[in-house]
Regions:
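Acidic/histidine-enriched segments that form metal/cofactor-coordinating
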Residues: 1-7, 54-56, 60-62, 171-188
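Proteolytic maturation boundary segments
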Residues: 26-67, 78, 109, 208-277
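Non-catalytic, conformational "gating/processing" segments within enzyme and secreted inhibitor domains
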Residues: 3-37, 233
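Short beta-strand/turn micro-motifs at beta-sheet edges
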Residues: 5-9, 62-66, 119-125
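Active/ligand-binding-proximal structured segments within catalytic/core domains
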Residues: 77, 87-99, 106-109
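M16 family metallopeptidases and their MPP-like homologs
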Residues: 16-22, 71-83, 109-215, 235-240
Length: 277
């Protein structure tokens, strides 16, 4: 509980928080109320240190398989990407739509419609620092996990052989820009999205991303795909349902002080150096 309290005191402070008010309200009285409620909280003495390091580029494909009881199979592919404020994030958002959109995305057409998977979904994480993009396929127990994995990788890492088309780009941009327009017209959604942009550095990033999406070209998507969707930058995970998981039994750490308390050892060697003659 002490660790939890220390974490709370360090980060849950007004100087590390964002407050957004959305909808129809009276600005002066609202600001006065905010000042009344939060202004009384003293400024903390602690200093929030900036991140002092970052993950280096991945130097080889990684894979993890989890075998537990369950009803569905999963295979997922994750790639490291740039920070959400980077220009590449707009092209990555469009690529995620081209590949993972429903019902026109390549993965939906080549996996779901062909009964290789029940569902395929993209997860694009734009963070203040380097982020990642993930594509996950869900299978029932009768579908072939190895075949689904094969097709998933071919679609993701085969964009140089099967480039994005002008029609796909146009459709992706229309979908993304439509979502942005809907967000702008919904005060609650807009507040949430602006808070995400603030966490990434500035509220204006939300509108900058819109402008970047509007100006996307095919070459932008192909360049981003070539840089990020490669084996050396890939982490692949699979969930394999197993009725009886085979787990090693790992003993707890022992009390070493108690273990050696009565230890006598063997007869001591003679003092001094021992030389072979």
């Amino acid at each position: 509980i002490e660790n939890l309290q220390n974490f709370y005191r360090k980060y849950y402070q007004p100087d590390n928080a964002v407050l957004l008010v959305a909808g129809k309200f009276e600005a002066a009285s609202t600001l006065a109320l905010i000042q009344q409620v939060f202004g009384a909280i003293p400024k903390p003495n602690r200093v929030l240190e900036p991140t002092y390091t970052q993950d280096p580029a991945q130097d080889g494909m990684r894979e993890v398989n989890v075998k537990r009881t369950g009803d569905v199979q999963l295979t997922a592919v994750l790639y490291h990407t740039a920070a959400g404020s980077h220009v590449d994030s707009a092209a990555m958002a469009a690529l995620s739509e081209v590949l993972g959109g429903t019902p026109n995305g390549r993965l939906h057409k080549n996996m779901v419609e062909k009964k290789l998977a029940v569902n395929v979904s993209p997860w694009n994480f734009d963070l203040a620092e380097r982020g990642y993009v993930m594509f996950m396929a869900e299978l029932n127990k009768t579908q072939n996990l190895a075949e689904a994995r094969k097709v998933l990788l071919e679609e993701l890492e085969g964009l140089q052989k099967k480039p994005v088309t002008e029609e796909e780009l146009k459709r992706a941009k229309a979908s993304l820009l439509s979502d942005i327009d809907k967000t702008i017209n919904d005060p609650q959604k807009l507040a949430v999205q602006l808070s995400e942009s603030i966490a990434n550095g500035d509220w204006r990033l939300f509108f900058l991303q819109r402008d970047r999406i509007e100006n996307l070209k095919l070459a932008d998507l192909q360049s981003v795909a070539a840089n990020y969707f490669k084996e050396s930058n890939r982490t692949l995970g699979q969930f394999i349902p197993t009725a009886t998981p085979d787990r090693s039994k790992l003993p707890d750490a022992v009390d070493v002080a108690k273990l050696v308390a009565d230890y006598k050892g063997k007869a001591a060697a003679s003092e001094g150096e021992v030389f072979d003659i």
